């Protein structure tokens, strides 16, 4: 798991400048770890998840007025058009059906000069270890709806109207 901790520390270091003094929406926050790690950099973070249980867990230990957790559907966000500086969706687009529809909703809430940050695990290499982990995710209730290589994921984003300004592959124990 040390490999995961290193990868996430690298991810946080990459994200902090992008959220500096910004209004941030994190979608699919899960336990809220990304939002909590970025709290000191952002002006305000709205961290959402479709699971009430995940939001309940994420709220534990949150004493900041700059961080608000709520249950939301990433396909129907309650935020005004062009009201968010940065949308973050970490490791989630591969587990939702029709991720392109989520991208449309993210574009709606982002300001014209806003930034989408969408790191995800790439599972398409089909290694035995990757396939085993994909099966474990499915059993845990997170079936993979999309299996991308890094290049295919970037192409998916571009095909859906996004300009990729930066792409970094971080080594993690989850492929």
Show the residue positions of the predicted features:
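Short catalytic micro-motifs in class I SAM-dependent methyltransferases
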Residues: 91-92
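Conserved alpha-helix/loop element of class I SAM-dependent methyltransferases that forms part
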Residues: 3-22
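Short alpha-helix
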Residues: 145-160
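A short glycine-rich, Lys/Arg-flanked "PGG" loop and its adjoining helix->strand segment in the class I
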Residues: 100-112
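Conserved class I S-adenosyl-L-methionine
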Residues: 117-140
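A conserved beta-strand element that flanks and buttresses the S-adenosyl-L-methionine
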Residues: 88
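Conserved S-adenosyl-L-methionine
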Residues: 162-172
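Class I SAM-dependent methyltransferase SAM/SAH-binding core
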Residues: 25, 31-76
């Amino acid at each position: 798991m040390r490999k995961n901790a290193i990868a996430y520390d690298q991810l946080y270091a990459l994200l902090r400048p992008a959220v500096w003094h910004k209004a941030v929406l994190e979608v699919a926050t899960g336990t809220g770890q990304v939002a909590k790690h970025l709290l000191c950099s952002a002006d305000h973070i709205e961290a959402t998840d479709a699971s009430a249980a995940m939001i309940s867990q994420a709220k534990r230990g949150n004493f900041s007025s700059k961080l608000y957790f709520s249950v939301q559907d990433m396909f129907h966000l309650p935020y005004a058009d062009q009201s968010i500086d940065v949308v973050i969706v970490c490791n989630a687009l591969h587990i939702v059906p029709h991720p392109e529809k989520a991208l449309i909703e993210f574009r709606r809430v982002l300001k014209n000069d806003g930034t989408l940050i969408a790191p995800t695990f790439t599972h398409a290499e089909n290694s035995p270890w990757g396939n085993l982990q994909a099966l474990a995710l499915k059993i845990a209730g997170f079936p993979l709806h999309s299996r991308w290589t890094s290049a295919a994921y970037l192409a998916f984003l571009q095909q859906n109207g996004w300009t990729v300004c930066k792409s970094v592959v971080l080594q993690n124990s989850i492929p």
